[in-house]
């Protein structure tokens, strides 16, 4: 569910702030080609491969997405949403629906329609080999006249041959990556994994992001990434969690099984790559000793049903974007967007006995 309101909410809640730890007795470009980035002659391919689609077709895909996404969001219609979203983005959007359904009607925000501004959209359409799954990336804005600050990936799903958005990342800057374009304005797709021409691949980037959350970047995070706003924010989430409950509880991050291993990479003008990937992590809040409880917040109601817990494990699915150099230098995490997709934990024993 890719409304700007919901995406803005997703960007920040990696450290859940809605729970309350308390004592048990208290309450709590043109149509013929994209040509929106600086052309780079070195990005040309030989022999020339066909682009994934034309710029006009890509704009039609974006327009269709906005239209159907609005219709689905208004009715919390998962089936309709499934016709324009897939992969990690669909899982994140469905969790938004679930959260909304857990709220009383009076607490639900009225839905506001939106659309992407095609006039400011910057298309990164790669040339692809015959038989290669088709995809493209786009820098988008949901406000007319405002520079794009969101990177989206659209892929043609083989099972039904339609284009769907699979990933979206809110960037920390409106300065977009310098994607290399050939003379006709098309990008060059490069392998996102096992690419010996890059300083890091998607698997290593994912490991580094998880380390930022889990250890504050001690093991791999600060070695792989330069200190950008995005990586600093992840490290701050970790450090804030360490002192969040004082001596009354703990908050710990860890990696989790990741169903979404697809990654997408485009060559950049400096010979490196823009890599778009996803990861999954957990945050487990727990009381330090008996006599304490965690009271779920209203946004957790769909999963936790207002039942006090001794611990809660939240699951987050996130989309990430990084620029990677061709030589052995740190990569730059330029944005990430997350959504809580599950929450669970053992109820307070006294509550279980009453039930």
UniProtKB/Swiss-Prot annotation:
Membrane topology: Lipid-anchor
Keywords, alphabetical: Cell membrane, Lipoprotein, Membrane, Palmitate, Signal
Top-rank taxon, per record: Bacteria
Lipid positions (N-palmitoyl cysteine): 28
Covalent lipid adducts (S-diacylglycerol cysteine), residues: 28
Biased composition (Polar residues): 39-48
A cellular-component GO term for this protein: plasma membrane
Compartments where located: Cell membrane
Entry annotated with the keyword Cell inner membrane: no
Signal peptide: 1-27
Main location class: membrane
Residue segments, region Disordered: 33-53
Sections of the chain in a coiled coil: none
The name this protein goes by in its record: Uncharacterized lipoprotein SCO6871
Organism of origin: Streptomyces coelicolor (strain ATCC BAA-471 / A3(2) / M145)
């Amino acid at each position: 569910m890719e409304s700007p309101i919901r995406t803005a909410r997703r960007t920040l809640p990696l450290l859940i702030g809605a729970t309350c730890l308390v004592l048990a007795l208290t309450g709590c470009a043109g149509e013929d080609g994209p040509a929106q980035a600086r052309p780079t002659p070195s990005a040309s391919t030989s022999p020339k491969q066909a682009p994934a689609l034309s710029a006009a077709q890509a704009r039609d895909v974006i327009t269709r997405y906005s239209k159907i996404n609005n219709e689905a969001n208004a009715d919390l219609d998962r089936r309709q949403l499934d016709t324009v979203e897939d992969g990690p983005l669909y899982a994140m959007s469905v969790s938004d629906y679930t959260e909304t359904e857990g709220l009383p009607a009076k607490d639900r925000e009225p839905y506001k329609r939106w659309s992407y501004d095609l006039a400011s959209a910057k298309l990164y359409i790669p040339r692809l080999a015959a038989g290669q799954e088709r995809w493209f990336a786009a820098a988008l804005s949901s406000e007319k006249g405002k520079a794009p600050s969101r990177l989206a990936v659209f892929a043609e799903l083989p099972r039904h041959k339609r284009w769907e958005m699979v990933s979206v990342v809110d960037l920390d800057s409106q300065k977009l990556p310098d994607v290399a374009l050939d003379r006709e304005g098309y990008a060059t797709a490069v392998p996102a994994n096992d690419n010996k021409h890059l300083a890091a691949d998607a698997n290593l980037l994912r490991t580094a992001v998880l380390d930022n959350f889990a250890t504050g970047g001690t093991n791999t995070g600060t070695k792989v990434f330069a200190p950008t706003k995005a990586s600093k924010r992840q490290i701050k989430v970790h450090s804030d969690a360490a002192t969040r409950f004082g001596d009354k509880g703990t908050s710990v991050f860890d990696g989790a099984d990741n169903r979404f291993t697809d990654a997408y990479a485009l060559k950049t003008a400096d010979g490196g790559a823009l890599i778009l990937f996803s990861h999954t992590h957990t945050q487990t809040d727990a009381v330090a000793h008996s006599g304490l409880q965690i009271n779920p917040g209203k946004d957790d109601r769909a999963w936790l049903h207002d039942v006090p817990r001794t611990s809660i494990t939240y699951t987050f699915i996130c989309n990430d974007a990084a620029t990677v150099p061709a030589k052995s230098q740190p990569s730059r995490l330029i944005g990430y967007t997350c959504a809580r997709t599950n929450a669970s934990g053992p109820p307070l024993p006294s509550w279980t006995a009453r039930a």
